[in-house]
Amino acid sequence: MKKVIFFTDFKKLHEALEHFDIQDFAGKKVPVKLHMGELKNKYFPRPDFVKQVVDELKKINADPYLFDTTVSYTGLRHSKTGYLKLAKIHGFTKKKIGCNVVIDDLGIPTTIEDREYEVAEHLADSTHIFAISHVKGHVATGMGGTIKNFGMGGVTKETKRRMHHGSRPVYLKD
């Protein structure tokens, strides 16, 4: 990662991307990693903002697609079909955004410091990734936007289960 840019004025997205070497994305398939929300929850990046990012990537001949992974708990995001339905409800469609929406539940086994993780196949196979994140806390990955977006959202359900299991409180009887 070359640079991290924080901004709040979405009208200045083009200017912000000028500070980021977006030309490196030209000619590449680019997963745009984001959380497309939960049912009845308004805290997720807005589709109109995401479309601006997709449009900027397309201007330089990148091939972007929206990307996320399924979750281990019950709900629409538990399956690819359910998550795609939820994405549509929240306005994340090819027609509205201008690119495909890909939900992954397959992983590539990856070992780091003697721990095995299943990294989402589309992320493991990518040379370039663009992340759009909202700030959120998580017991296993801490407070963060993009770090949490990849820490929990870039792995398979099985890896998520293992990470959550490791952070459960333990009751010790005296």
Describe the residue ranges of each PLM region:
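N-terminal and secondary-structure boundary signal
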Residues: 1-174
